[in-house]
Amino acid sequence: MTLNLPDTIKFVITDFDGIVTDNCVYIDSKGEMTRKLNFKDVMAFSILRKNGYHIGIVSGEKNSAIEIIAKKFKVEEVHQDIRVKIDVIKSIIERYKLKKDEFVYIGDDINDLETLKFAKYAITVPDAVNQVKAIDGIQITTAHGGNGAFREVVDCLVK
């Protein structure tokens, strides 16, 4: 599916696991959890910054990959270990005085449902849970989470 986003978008807000990562957690011999990132998706953060977009990451989990990405690319809004994402999204919208056609939300799981239904522009990945893919009007990337999906959204915005 070809994504369709307007020129009015100023803020890209995304979940992390399942969108920027492949939704897998790797556990090393010391019991530390790590995640794999695709460089296409990492580069997408740089492209957004260079083109004047605001960026937000709202994740249900806390992990060091988010902190590294946020610091490197000066992500304005970073919220980890969030159970009720809609409250955070509404707070961001209020703080930045955004209209509903000025932000896009990208998510893939049940903890994103309420936010995806609230967003005028909602995007998910092919491997999202069925409840997310069934949302009326949701757009689905061609690329899977952690394999260029975030970059696909960014490439749609930055032509």
Positions of predicted regions on the chain:
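Alpha-helical substrate-recognition element adjacent to the catalytic core
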Residues: M1-V84
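Mg2+-dependent phosphoryl-transfer enzymes with acidic/Ser/Thr/Gly-rich catalytic loops
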Residues: T34-R35, I86-K159
